[in-house]
């Protein structure tokens, strides 16, 4: 359903999900907002459970694939969260778009196995700036791409390097870094 809210999608006919994109249905307690928030943070938490199993990067290509999948899923979820719950792209008076890295972003959920202390994890659970969130997404997707090198996914339900590169491209397009996209 987020595709309908994208920059290049217009829907003129009646449909069951049109109400989700009306301004009256954007309150914090509305079902779509709650579903998006809960689903995406569940993805982050499940990815963190997998990341927590690894004290260091594994050498086995299958285990590297599992860890790479977890980092890619967390990057993907945070990428959607920042787009749904903050508008990081702003226009100046001339209509030129840019990223305001100082705007409030979203809470980041990380693990102690990544080197964070409990105090740091607690402080990241508050709203971080858009810049901090973008830095975390870029770090996660970069790590995922590195870990997925040489990994052959068993089916299309699993992320491989090409899929992670697609997530990275979407991130860099949003971040207006055309050369990296």
Language-model features and meaning:
Residues 10-31, 107-128:
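Short, helix-capping/interhelical loops that line the mouth of catalytic, cofactor-
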Residues 69, 76-116:
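Extended ligand-binding groove/face enriched in aromatic
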Residues 16-88, 128-132, 143-151:
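Conserved, well-structured interaction surfaces
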Residues 1-6:
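Acidic, glycine-rich segments characteristic of secretory precursors and extracytoplasmic regions
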């Amino acid at each position: 359903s987020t595709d309908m809210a994208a920059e290049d999608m217009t829907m003129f006919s009646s449909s069951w999900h049109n109400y989700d994109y009306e301004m009256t249905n954007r309150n914090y307690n509305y079902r779509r907002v709650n579903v998006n928030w809960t689903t995406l943070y569940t993805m982050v938490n499940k990815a963190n459970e997998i990341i927590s199993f690894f004290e260091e990067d594994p050498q086995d290509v299958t285990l590297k694939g599992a860890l790479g999948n977890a980092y890619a899923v967390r990057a993907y979820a945070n990428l959607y969260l920042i787009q749904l719950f903050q508008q990081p792209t702003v226009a100046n008076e001339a209509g030129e778009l840019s990223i305001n890295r100082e705007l409030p972003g979203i809470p980041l959920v990380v693990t102690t196995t990544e080197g964070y202390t409990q105090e740091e994890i607690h402080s990241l659970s508050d709203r971080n700036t858009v810049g901090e969130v973008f830095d975390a997404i870029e770090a996660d997707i970069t790590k995922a791409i590195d870990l997925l090198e040489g990994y052959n996914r068993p089916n299309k339900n699993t992320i491989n390097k090409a899929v992670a590169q697609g997530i990275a491209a979407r991130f860099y397009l949003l971040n207006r870094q055309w050369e990296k996209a």
